[in-house]
Amino acid sequence: MTESPTTSPATGSGAAAPDSDAPPYRYTAALAGRIEGSWQDTWAKLGTFNVPNPVGSLAPTDGTPVPEDKLFVQDMFPYPSGEGLHVGHPLGYIATDVYARYFRMTGRNVLHALGFDAFGLPAEQYAVQTGTHPRTRTEANVVNFRRQLGRLGLGHDSRRSFSTTDVEFYKWTQWIFLQIYNAWFDPAANKARPIAELVAEFDSGARSLDDGRNWSELSAGERADVIDSHRLVYRADSMVNWCPGLGTVLANEEVTADGRSDRGNFPVFRKRLRQWMMRITAYSDRLLDDLDLLDWPEPVKTMQRNWIGRSTGAKALFAATGADGAALDIEVFTTRPDTLFGATYMVLAPEHELVDELVAPAWPDGTDPRWTYGAATPGEAVAAYRRAIASKSDLERQESKAKTGVFLGSYATNPTNGKPVPIFIADYVLAGYGTGAIMAVPGHDQRDWDFAHEFGLPIVEVIAGGDISEGAYAGDGLLVNSGYLDGLDVAAAKEAITARLEAEGRGCARVEFKLRDWLFARQRYWGEPFPIVYDSDGRPHALDEAALPVELPDVPDYSPVLFDPDDADSEPSPPLAKATDWVHVELDLGDGLKPYSRDTNVMPQWAGSSWYELRYTDPHNSERFCAKENEAYWMGPRPAEHGPQDPGGVDLYVGGAEHAVLHLLYARFWHKVLYDLGHVSSREPYRRLVNQGYIQAFAYTDSRGSYVPAEEVVERDGRFFYRGPDGEIEVFQEFGKIGKSLKNSISPDEICDDYGADTLRVYEMSMGPLEASRPWATKDVVGAHRFLQRVWRLVVDEQTGETRVVDGAGRDLPTGTLRLLHRTIAGVSEDYAGLRNNTAVAKLIEYTNHLTKEHRDAVPRAAVEPLVLMLAPLAPHMAEELWLRLGHTTSLAHGPFPVADPAYLVEDTVEYPVQVNGKVRGRVTVAADADRDTLEAAALADEKVLAFLAGAQPRKVIVVPGRLVNLVV
């Protein structure tokens, strides 16, 4: 138990805020503020929410073992913006605090802490504008966030808080990067292994090179190239999303559907650049299959499944001849190999690596003008087309109804029938999916049909059952016009043609994924530096772990070189390149002192959040990112509790669904690599996920659509008015996400000032289910405040400040109070455990109203103390204060939470509706164990029922036990 002060510094001898109309000891905002500040100081001083670890600096100093019954609760940590919190931000934080407080009161060892995701573009942009170092701005924002969050009374272990920008934190982000860099994925073992083991296998001859070369005959540079090609982190000349307006490349997930940057709304262009990539695709199957092990919302699982996008089909090779006469194979992946005989043309992504080799020097005789893009030569047409589609996002390219493309002037050979098929490029084919090339079967794929119709290409039916003159037929049927496949159904045809392709060496069965490798570099300043240097030949070398952390240097200018947002031909120039003294170093990497250059990119903002849950378990460890014992205790699998397939992970993770295919996917990938390498015992980072809804607020626009300050709008007769500089005008109400842009932001500080933090907590939890979005209405906050005032009055005399309870045993309570008490305990316990805080509030209000009505003079201690304990997770400051006033000398933060007596949950009596010919005409109350005869007699004796019977005798009496009595006349 945590000791409490014997008298409250907040209210020991003080009264409520001065108000001539209010009783001196009424629970007001001023009194709430003093109570809340006092208890927050007490909790901090006593370390009330500090939780022990099995080992390390946070382990019990007396050697006491940690409790077996643990609970790890985590919020998605905030980005500390300059605007601070609005009332929408605390929704999830309060919900998890209620959850953690409840289970802490039941005796569980609860870890609940909050850090800050502090790297990112906003702080960098502010630094560019003001010349202030991003760290200065970020640290000031963190201080303000901690102040605002502190006012809410969140029961966090503050010793475990950190920012991703802390050098002590990002040292381990860099360390994990090195673990991934120095690993490779072994398909046979379906797991990552240390790269040293791959080298050992090549050295011993246990593994051969795929290209047939002899490992022992390779030069050191050639061996390094082979090893680098296997690493889970690698450099590649890849098509990337280049944003000149931001001066950096973006991940696919950071580009909007209309081909613009998610931040800043700048145009984004597809461009080939050499970038760091993470081989997340190696984990596609495991990332997909292990979703079944997780207690996550099904929509989030569906989003991840769709993003990973597993497809089963076949690879087929189409022979072609390059412009220089060289023989080429164009590889396609198709989920419909049964339709190969219907392939009448091919389409490559404009970025496909073979396009330039396949472009003919001139148009073949008789080329359809529709195929030429209005250009004199295929080369000119390809260049013009690439420029035209450079700023289109993948989604735009796939969803565009207008089909465009360019003929390359060359042909490939259909491997099934030997017929030549023209080769096009078109924007609806993406380089990032499959092989970046498709066989076009217009008879049975609508996009191919549309393209063929637009360009006058042949359409062949190979599956009977539809009218391909009107559109593609995608249904089942028997194969036609397909040689040896004729007469087979689709399934049999797939199997037969795949076998034939394999036998002829022109294809094989294949599984493909939509998921692409993770672009893991940004041309920014405010991010984690890479622990990588380059030698004079430009070859990358990983730094030794002893060289970590690689700290960010100060630079005179924090901005990347920004370009005209429409300049697609511009090239990245990172700000770290300006720190020449930092970039150019002399190091001994095992072969003597040599000059090297540091990598001038930084990691994406997702890096720190990909592992931060692990650091909460051991935040001060300077030797490891976390001790294995601490990770195993807080996150290890618990099959006895969660089932034999339990992957482990955080017990409850709460945050927004918008991170489904970003943070959550990246975190799962990093965690699986760490698991494979033996660094963690849990297979997944988050066992259970809950997505909280959003708090929305009314916003108001004038006749031009411009937003006006919501707090200055008044309502009259259902219409809304705003008094601006030109007088009062009518404005129009709409719902919107709370924020600065809609001028409807409301600070939690305002609500705490006007009502107190406990009122804010109760109000937000009472607004509806956690997962649902809900409208904010400041005028409704007073309802939560009045509820807390009623609870206060049950214990404290508003005139004298004295406690107004009477002692007595619980069994002496009136039966109605006793039954309602235990029903409330049972219901509230279930609600807290199920994150149904809104219904818990409703039950507490019902019980409070009952006590207020039935015990006007003084409330029995046995009735009110359980109420105070039940209220504690929701309104902890008031509950602590009332608990102290009730004579207790220990904090209730660690319980005990009341336990319902099952004997009082069984009703003595049951009310039955009585129907006459199926319509309810009366109600009777009988003993819960009443038999059929007793029920029938009671129904026939009811005055209202007798009036409807009017002397008639029922022909039949139907009794449904526990539900109703029906008299048929």
Swiss-Prot record:
SUPFAM superfamilies: Anticodon-binding domain of a subclass of class I aminoacyl-tRNA synthetases, Nucleotidylyl transferase, ValRS/IleRS/LeuRS editing domain. A motif ('KMSKS' region) lies at residues 737-741. It is found in: Cytoplasm. The keyword NAD does not apply. One of its GO terms (cellular component) is cytosol. It catalyses: tRNA(Leu) + L-leucine + ATP = L-leucyl-tRNA(Leu) + AMP + diphosphate. ATP binds at K740. Signal peptide: none annotated. InterPro entries: aa-tRNA-synth_I_CS (IPR001412), Leu-tRNA-ligase (IPR002302), Leu_tRNA-synth_edit (IPR025709), M/V/L/I-tRNA-synth_anticd-bd (IPR013155), Methionyl/Leucyl_tRNA_Synth (IPR015413), Rossmann-like_a/b/a_fold (IPR014729), tRNAsynth_Ia_anticodon-bd (IPR009080), Val/Leu/Ile-tRNA-synth_edit (IPR009008). Its EC number is 6.1.1.4. Pfam families: Anticodon_1, tRNA-synt_1_2, tRNA-synt_1g. NCBIfam families: leuS_bact. This is Leucine--tRNA ligase. It comes from Mycobacterium avium (strain 104). The gene is leuS.
